[in-house]
UniProtKB/Swiss-Prot annotation:
PANTHER family cross-referenced by the UniProt entry: (E,E)-GERANYLLINALOOL SYNTHASE, ENT-COPALYL DIPHOSPHATE SYNTHASE, CHLOROPLASTIC
Amino-acid positions noted as binding Mg(2+) 1 in the UniProt annotation, renumbered to this chain: D561, D565
Location of the motif DDXXD motif: 561-565
Pathway this chain belongs to: Terpene metabolism; oleoresin biosynthesis
Binding site for Mg(2+) 3: D709, E717
Taxonomy of the source species: Eukaryota, Viridiplantae, Streptophyta, Embryophyta, Tracheophyta
Domain of life: Eukaryota
An example Gene Ontology CC term for this record: cytoplasm
Record protein name field: (E)-gamma-bisabolene synthase
Organism of derivation: Pseudotsuga menziesii
Reactions listed under catalytic activity: (2E,6E)-farnesyl diphosphate = (E)-gamma-bisabolene + diphosphate
Enzyme Commission number, as recorded: 4.2.3.59
């Protein structure tokens, strides 16, 4: 008999009371006591982490300066530069303009006769690089032995390919460029197997690509600039020069730029090539400059690995640099000099800049739509397209209300990525090495708004590859982006933080055992689940007090929740509520012992939270927090009265009460006000807290949490006789709608609220509220969305939740 008036002649001991604790706590105290992490005892780990931080800071200083970009050589591009004849009229054209590049080719042939990336895993890359080097050496009639060995490599490799299925992933525009170079080799009578079925297939594919490639697309600034050397017959040179970048290059490609110079003699092209060789010496990379892409990739990696707090200055400098070249009309390319924008770089830039509260507009993505409304990076460049679409999909998750183009792009990219997963050729050895399929599956399965930051950091540590290579016309590496030091620091940092959190968990468990809360056997006892709820997003050591107080308040809240929902009678609850409103413990004298104990614990935790808040904030906050708790308890009492009367309110009435009864406001305020070093003025509190203003951060958090809870728990609650839920109340207002339609309506509200919450969180020029405070609120909400993703995992600790807990707090990363 729950929340009802006590019948005459029946004592409280005679009542048959329900409980809300169907499952015991799955985390044993003995397990926690057994945790003895070496990372908390051995100071050498912390010393090594500090050393790595300093070394990486120095590395980033070099990367973000105007020095040499750490990018691997491209034999393919170097060979194109080597083909440029001397511009010195006195010597004719019988010698190269850049003889050092010819020497580099002669010295860098691999043991198997190829050129390209050593230990290559894509056959298309050495094929393209080798034919390029062979043609360059043959042009200058040098390196006969190298030419012979190169031709033998080409012959043996091509003869092994019986059909298209034998060919792995293709470097960018391979089917455009390689047949063109084969045609040149044939005109020079180089002994290659030109009649092989695979060669004929490539020729056919090239013709199909070119048939769909109009001259307008070539000269329109969108497509094929990176493969000019493969479409010589279609180029209109005067129109093409309009697409030249400020640094003289064409899409930062030394090969394409060398090709244009050979045909036009353009001095800006020559100046670009001179500048690249001045940087790198005897070789050129496949792309230069890549200063915007490199900075964005570094920031993205550091943040996804969970070590960004160590590099805040460097991250801000990198993003300030990128933003100087950002255009909401055209986006950005790989480098600051690019005349043509790139979808991957633009999408990555949009996401990171928005996350750091720069003003960026989604209008930028209109440029990447074709006449059919599809979003493109380059037609036929499938590997590149997948990466671009994944970055665009992630960018779309940061949509604000009314940004329809992001909704459109998200739908398009989700469909594209699902289809990509079904195509086996998408995930050949190239993309398997990138772990691209895992990234796509995770992105499609896990919404950014419902994800666990600490789990994501650990999993990214597990897939991050220091030897990661990117794919263009060559396989290339950006050494500042992926390297051993960054990964070592990320793993060390994760384990060191985990060891700190394990000690905190022991303190939480000890507090809980001594608090008296375990005596309330009718209530859910989830101290470690609540600790996980805050810690999975706010894990920094300095916020230990925030985590502890959040957990304590959550434990007390849950006892109150279960007492009002299931265990207490209405008469008891009225007296308890009155005692809360008057803050008078003497009013509990006529209540059962369990309620007296409950009130004392409640009273003590409220004032502990207030006193800790006052110490941190330096002003009186007891009355503020008391009022918040009063509102919270009154909302519980309202629901108890509904239950007793079997009353189902209308949707608006339910939501008005439900955003308070969900408990997020009291919970988050308690942790928020004790965050180390984060002072919240009255003005800042009013910007966060919904009793003062509507549609602010706290109200949005409470609304989306309430609805998420309802969508997962309403069936179980209805079975227990609790009739009021968002779904039932909406159906009361709309008798004609089905349960499924009501659920869809609720999901629609949640989607809109998530966008409003994102906008409030990432609001530009909102300096009154410390961003660390906003982040704590937002990250806790993300974890809450995971809790209610497939059922109420706080009430029923499911296996997946247990796995998340172990990932974050129990199992270290192997070094």
């Amino acid at each position: 008999m729950a929340a009802s008036t006590l019948p005459s002649g029946l004592s409280t001991n005679d009542l048959i009371r329900r409980t809300a604790n169907p499952h015991p706590n799955v985390w044993g105290y003995d397990l926690l006591c057994s945790l003895k992490s070496p990372y908390s005892r051995d100071s050498s780990y912390k010393e090594r982490a500090d050393t790595l931080i300093n070394e990486i800071k120095a590395m980033l200083g070099a990367a973000f300066g105007d020095g040499k970009e750490m990018i691997t050589p491209s034999a393919y591009d170097t060979a194109w530069v080597a083909r440029i004849p001397s511009i010195d009229g006195s010597s004719g054209s019988a010698r190269p303009q850049f003889p050092q590049t010819v020497d580099w080719i002669l010295k860098n042939q691999l043991k198997d006769g190829s050129w390209g990336t050593e230990s290559h895993f894509l056959l298309s890359e050495p094929l393209l690089a080798t034919i390029s080097c062979v043609l360059a050496l043959f042009k200058w009639q040098v390196g006969d032995l190298q030419v012979e060995r190169g031709i033998e490599f080409l012959k043996s490799s091509l003869e092994k390919i019986k059909n298209e299925s034998d060919q792995d992933s293709l470097v960018t525009d391979f089917e455009i460029i390689f047949p063109s170079m084969l045609r040149e080799a044939q005109s020079l009578h180089l002994g290659l197997p030109y009649d092989l079925p695979y060669i004929q297939l490539l020729q056919t594919k090239r013709q199909e690509r070119l048939a769909n490639l109009s001259r307008e697309k070539i000269h329109g600034g969108i497509l094929q600039l990176s493969s000019l050397e493969g479409i010589e017959d279609m180029v209109e040179w005067e129109r093409l020069m309009d697409l030249q970048s400020l640094d003289g290059s064409f899409l930062s490609s030394p090969a394409s730029t060398a090709f244009v110079f050979i045909h036009t003699g353009d001095l800006k092209c020559l100046a670009f090539l001179n500048s690249v060789l001045a940087k790198f010496g005897a070789f050129v990379p496949c792309l230069y400059h890549v200063d915007l892409l490199e900075r964005l990739l570094i920031v993205d990696n550091i943040e996804r690995l969970g070590i960004d707090r160590h590099f805040e200055k460097e991250i801000n400098e990198a993003l300030d640099y990128v933003y100087r070249y950002w255009s909401n009309e055209r986006g950005i390319g790989w480098g600051r000099m690019n005349a043509t924008a790139d979808l991957e770089t633009t999408a990555l830039g949009f996401r990171l800049l928005r996350l750091h509260r720069y003003h960026v507009s989604p209008v930028v993505f209109k440029k990447f739509k074709d006449a059919d409304g599809e979003f493109l990076s380059s037609i036929g460049q499938f590997n590149k397209d997948v990466a671009s679409m994944l970055n665009l999909y992630r960018a779309c998750e940061l949509a604000f209300p009314g940004e329809n183009i992001l909704d459109e792009a998200k739908g398009f990219t989700a469909k594209y990525l699902r289809e990509a997963l079904e195509k086996t050729e998408t995930f050949s050895s190239w993309n398997i090495k990138r772990n691209l399929s895992q990234e796509i599956k995770y992105a499609l399965k896990t919404s950014w708004h419902a994800s666990i930051p600490r789990v994501e950091a650990k999993r990214y540590c597990q897939v991050y590859r220091p030897d990661y290579a990117r794919l263009d016309k060559s396989v290339y590496k950006l050494h500042h982006v992926n390297n051993e030091k960054i990964l070592e620091l990320a793993k060390l940092d994760f384990n060191i933080i985990q060891s700190i959190l394990q000690e905190e968990m022991k303190n939480v468990t000890s507090w809980f055992r001594d608090s008296g809360l375990p005596l309330f056997s009718f209530a859910r006892q989830r101290p470690l689940e609540f600790y996980f709820l805050i810690t999975a997003g706010t894990y920094e050591p300095r916020y230990a007090k925030c985590r502890l107080l959040f957990t304590k308040v959550a434990c007390v809240e849950t006892v109150l929740d279960d007492m009002y929902d299931t265990y207490g009678t209405l008469d008891e609850l009225k007296l308890f509520t009155q005692a809360v409103r008057r803050w008078d413990p003497s009013l509990t004298e006529n209540l059962p012992d369990y309620m007296k104990r409950c009130y004392k614990i409640f009273y003590d935790i409220v004032h502990e939270a207030a006193w800790e808040a006052e110490k941190e904030q330096g002003r009186e906050l007891v009355s503020f927090l008391r009022k918040a708790w009063e509102d919270f308890v009154l909302s519980y009492h309202e629901e108890a009265e509904w239950l007793s009367a079997e009353y189902v309110p209308g949707f608006d009435e339910y939501i008005k009460n439900g955003i308070t009864s969900i408990g997020q406001r009291v919970l988050l305020l308690s942790g928020l006000l004790v965050m180390d070093g984060q002072l919240l003025s009255q003005k800042a509190l009013e910007k966060i807290d919904y009793p003062e203003r509507s549609r602010v951060l706290m109200e949005q958090i409470c609304l989306i949490s309430r609805l998420a809870d309802d969508t997962q728990s309403y069936k179980a609650e209805k079975a227990r006789g609790e009739l009021a839920s968002g779904i039932e109340c909406y159906m009361k207002d709309h008798p004609e709608c089905t349960e499924e339609e009501a659920l869809n309506h609720i999901y629609g509200i949640m989607e809109v609220t998530a966008k409003e919450l994102t906008k409030e969180y990432l609001k530009v020029d909102d300096d009154d509220v410390p961003f660390a405070c906003k982040k704590m609120l937002f990250e806790e909400t993300r974890v809450t969305m995971v809790i209610f993703k497939d059922g109420d995992r706080l009430s029923n600790s499911k296996l997946e939740m247990k796995d998340h807990f172990k990932e974050c707090l129990i199992e270290p990363l192997p070094l």
